[in-house]
Amino acid sequence: MQDATRLVIFLHGVGSSGADLLPLAGPLRHALPGTAFAAPDAPFPFPYGMGHQWFSIAGVTEDNRAGRIKAARADFDRVIGEIIETHVFADKLDRVAFVGFSQGTIMALDALASGRWPVGAIVAFSGRLASPYPLSPGKATPVLLVHGAADSVIPAAETVKATAILQGLGVDVESRILPGVDHTISAEGIELVGEFLAGRLSN
């Protein structure tokens, strides 16, 4: 999009692709006029299907997950850096938002928690904060965490936990647990994205 004033980057989950999330841009265009949307594929193929992954989940445990996230940072940064360069937002990170789902949320929150990407806002669906310590998040980035109460893949307790940790580190965090919602981005969730980014992302 030429002359976009904001950039939203969708980050998909395991076994998915950017093309699966890009349609979410449709209902967000009214709330976020003048916004460009991008939805990259994660850099690694998912071995059990046709999609992609940010890091391997084969044999992943609570003990080794943080190490895998750390190892995935360079490739994540390359993918994000290319998008930001393409859209000419390198000097306008305060106008960039990450919207993650599941593993995409893990990587979005890691980008914040490590202090690597001081973007304008982050919306994180159905994921967890699993970054290696110590955490050094940029405190200027507001965060919205959204999780389905009926999530059968990653329990909503992970969002409750992430909220407490990030707030304890001085991050501006809002969280919403949506009753009856499983591991998905619901219509209500999309409305929350539009409202949050319209109010918090620089234009």
Language-model regions, residue ranges each:
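Primarily recognizes the serine-hydrolase "nucleophile elbow" in alpha/beta-hydrolase
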Residues: 93-140
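Short beta-strand/loop motif that positions the catalytic acidic residue
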Residues: 145-147, 151
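Short N-terminal helix/helix-N-cap motif within the alpha/beta-hydrolase-1
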Residues: 18-19, 133, 186
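Serine-hydrolase catalytic machinery in alpha/beta-hydrolase-like enzymes
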Residues: 1-94
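Alpha/beta-hydrolase-fold catalytic nucleophile elbow
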Residues: 40-41, 99, 123-126, 146, ...
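Alpha/beta-hydrolase fold active-site loops
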Residues: 6, 141-142
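Conserved alpha/beta-hydrolase "nucleophile elbow" surrounding the catalytic nucleophile
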Residues: 12-14, 96-101, 148
